[in-house]
């Protein structure tokens, strides 16, 4: 779970109590990783469906609290579910495409819930609805102007990316393993953990890189160390 905290070290090295980073942007990634762990360990198909429903509901809340964190959660959970099917079926099998479209549908529903919730609250408080530009004003302004963006340096960032790429490379070869009907003999626990953490790592990198402080690399060390340990 520590792999997704993405922020507490800010409090240690600079005393920056910016709670929009932690715990607000960390709670839902941590919770989702916990749900993924339970989902993977559960054998009951019904229980898996319930856990998946809870996960998508939490993703809708994540989008509401912090849109970027919610997008990270969407990518990670959808990728995890698709990966589990890819261990069982080839990409030519209709079952895996059914899973892919189901994850896209769930992602769209979560985003619509977020938009409707924001619009409802805004309308009740102001009597007006937000336009699309107003709804995503903060994100568009930040990305468009490079607000507080600093050029990244090489060194630790390159090591970080190398670890993520190697972890992803180590997880994917099992997709080429022999599939026998619904079963695959190889244990996919390690490769699933590598895949999920690597995707988290890439998403977190795209989010934190260059933002305000070059020392943001230290907020991502949990992921790197966890991958190296695995």
Task: Place the predicted regions along the sequence by residue.
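Short hydrophobic alpha-helices at membrane interfaces in multi-pass membrane enzymes
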Residues: 30, 39-61, 95-102, 184-198
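Membrane-interface alpha helices of multi-pass inner-membrane proteins
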Residues: 51-67, 73-78, 200-207
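Transmembrane catalytic cores of multi-pass membrane glycosyltransferases
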Residues: 1-25, 67-194, 207-218
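Alpha-helical transmembrane segments of multi-pass membrane proteins
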Residues: 25-37, 55, 73, 111, ...
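Conserved small/polar residues in nucleotide/adenosyl-binding loops
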Residues: 228-230
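Small-side-chain structural scaffolding
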Residues: 2-3, 37, 55, 62, ...
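Hydrophobic membrane-spanning alpha-helices of multi-pass integral membrane proteins
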Residues: 191-204, 220-226
């Amino acid at each position: 779970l520590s792999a997704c905290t993405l922020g507490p070290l800010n409090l240690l090295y600079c005393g920056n109590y910016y709670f929009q980073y932690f715990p607000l942007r960390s709670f839902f990634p941590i919770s989702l990783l916990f749900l993924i762990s339970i989902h993977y360990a559960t054998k009951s198909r019904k229980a898996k469906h319930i856990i998946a429903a809870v996960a998508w509901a939490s993703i809708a809340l994540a989008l509401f609290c912090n849109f970027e964190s919610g997008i990270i959660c969407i990518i990670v959970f959808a990728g995890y579910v698709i990966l589990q099917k890819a261990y069982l079926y080839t990409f030519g099998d209709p079952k895996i495409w059914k899973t892919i479209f189901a994850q896209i549908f769930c992602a769209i529903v979560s985003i619509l819930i977020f938009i409707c919730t924001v619009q409802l609250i805004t309308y009740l408080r102001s009597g007006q609805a937000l336009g699309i530009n107003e709804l995503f004003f903060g994100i568009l302004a930040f990305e468009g102007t490079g607000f507080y963006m600093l050029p990244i340096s090489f060194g630790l960032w390159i090591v970080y990316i190398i670890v993520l790429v190697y972890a992803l490379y180590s997880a994917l070869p099992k997709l080429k393993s022999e599939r026998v009907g619904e079963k695959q003999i190889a244990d996919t626990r390690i490769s699933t953990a590598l895949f999920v953490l690597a995707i988290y790592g890439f998403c977190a990198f795209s989010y934190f890189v260059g933002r305000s402080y070059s020392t943001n690399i230290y907020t991502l060390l949990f992921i790197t160390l966890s991958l190296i340990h695995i």
